[in-house]
Amino acid sequence: MRDLELPKHGLQIVAIEGGTVFTRDGDYLASFRNYHAKKRELERFSVKDSESYSRYSRDILKQCRFIQPLLMRTAADPASFKFRDLSEMLYLLRKVNDLTASELADTVRFWTMSISDFLDEYFENDVIKASLAVSGIIGTALGPMSPGTAYVLLHHYMGEVDGSIGAWGYARGGMGAISKALTSSFRAMGGTLLNNSEVEKVDISGARVKGVILKNGDEYLAKNVVSNADVKRTFLKLTDPEHLPPNFVKKVNNFKIRGSSGKVNIALDSMPNFPVISDNNPCLKGDIHFTDSIERMERAYDDWKMGTWSRDPFLDMMIPLSLIHI
């Protein structure tokens, strides 16, 4: 956002103020951006868990501080002796060397454990654990008891809105506002945007990219071609595989891009009413979940693994109208 100056081109992000988990007994657990309000809400379900939340947040932020600088760097190839790869390996070793033996053990353990096991170390209430486990599985083809899902949690704690770490938000005006801001920024930098111009193939000659050829036959020359299509479409359909190393083509063919979730947009004639929550409660201006235990999440994942629709699916609902049109 900063590099492209998207706020200058009209993009405004409205921070999500909270979230909700509805339970099968008619109750709900609210979540708030405000730390103290969140702890008070946790007390309704477990005083012990409310007290543990501070330790949980501290440990999560500790892991975030370690991994965040690494995310913007290109991972090293451990089998390569190229200077860049050796430099990256040395950088990682220095980061690891800064940790104590205990911190290193905790970090390695955290990266490999499930979100279910991780939450068990802090909390006892099923609803509280279910509300926090969502950040370990959403957008993945994994269940809360799958190894590695604790690490996924970090990506949801490293979000940022206007300098507020851990915050998430909506684009005011909907997703189209992001496209408009990107278009405006691109054109301001001298770019030309072509609509309804499907690419037929990437033109390659003499082992070098020349440009792209459109479906209508038009050709655009370029020294560099950047693709936002998926890896298989880019290298197996838009690019003739004969121009690529056979081993690379094999790896692309084996790359898994199976979807793990579906999205349904529903137009309503009015705002939905939740009898147990007041309409102005900020917890409704965020994620709304209906799965109140980790066990139910895992059972939904079991059905997906068997190639069938989940009989009791994990549902994540949002009402963006309550937030973006302000």
Can you name each region flagged by the protein language model?
Residues 170-172, 198-324:
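Mid-domain catalytic core of redox enzymes
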Residues 30, 34, 48, 52, ...:
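Catalytic cores of large soluble enzymes that bind and process phosphate-bearing ligands
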Residues 186-199:
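A conserved beta-strand/loop element that lines the FAD pocket in flavoprotein oxidoreductases
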Residues 1:
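Conserved N-terminal glycine-rich FAD pyrophosphate-binding loop of Rossmann-like flavoproteins
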Residues 25-26, 143-147, 203-210:
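A short, glycine/Asx- and small/polar-enriched loop/turn
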Residues 4-72, 81:
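Dinucleotide-binding Rossmann-like beta1-alpha1 core, especially the glycine-rich loop
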Residues 61-189:
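Active-site/ligand-binding neighborhood in enzyme catalytic cores
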Residues 130-131, 195, 227:
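General beta-strand structural signal in soluble alpha/beta enzymes
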